[in-house]
Amino acid sequence: MLDKLATERRNEQTMHLDEMSIEERLTIMNAEDHKVPQVIQEQLPVITQVVERVIASFRKGGRLIYIGAGTSGRLGILDAAECVPTFGVSPNQVIGLIAGGERALIQAVEGAEDSKELAVTDLKALHLTAEDTVVGIAASGRTPYVVGGLDYARELGATTASISCNRDAVISRHADYPIEVETGPEVLTGSTRLKAGTAQKLVLNMISTTSMIGVGKVYQNLMVDVQPTNEKLEVRAKRMIAEATGVDMEMAARYFASSKGHVKTAIVMILADVSYEEAVKRLERANGFVREAL
């Protein structure tokens, strides 16, 4: 079964990889990576459908849950973790599950990815509901842990999607919205942390970012729900206030303070010329969308 997968085949362009110069190896890796955005483009229609379902889940109080093993699981956890500071959401709104749990983030957990039951246990621990969207991630497209998770999610009526890097993947038959980004043979045979991992990360970026835009977490192209948890982010937050409203940095800093460090509230205060309390009310009525609050 594995030897028939494109991601497991030998790459004809790299049969003499060990004999190449460093620059030659880097050049061919770069050339192979350039193929990834092209194959993702072919999947944009189904990625669009997935985003629409995630937005619908969020609006109903549901969550986006990634589930995967190995590199795929780590990428899901990475994307989920970044949503908290970037969009100011609860850690419970976007969640990443990896076969074998936290220990699997830094070392292999033998047999974990081969257990469908383990995925069910992990999802039950999250109290999965029909309002959630579950995205199964597997470069091979056949990981039992992911299949088990998708099947359980469908039983509960949750929306399911899959991201694989092979055509006609097994997990595609277990998901409502299968995304198949066929990345082909790797530079290093079978090392799907390379092109396949890059493709998965790009698709996850698309899903989480555009879903958050769909629920009001972005104004213009600014991440106005950012959590300014360090000096760099605080400076960025003040700059966003200035850029969105046209005020200088000194004025932006004053509004940053009076808005209790909340960028979108400061923007509404300035552009609508209202108090902090009124800006908060407007944003609540507008479900967090700055344009509608103005």
Curated annotation (Swiss-Prot):
Active site residues per record: 82, 113
Top-rank taxon, per record: Bacteria
Pfam families: GKRP_SIS_N (PF22645)
Family listed: Belongs to the GCKR-like family. MurNAc-6-P etherase subfamily.
Oligomeric form and interacting partners: Homodimer.
Protein's job: Specifically catalyzes the cleavage of the D-lactyl ether substituent of MurNAc 6-phosphate, producing GlcNAc 6-phosphate and D-lactate.
The protein's name: N-acetylmuramic acid 6-phosphate etherase
Upper taxonomic lineage: Bacteria, Bacillati, Bacillota, Bacilli, Bacillales
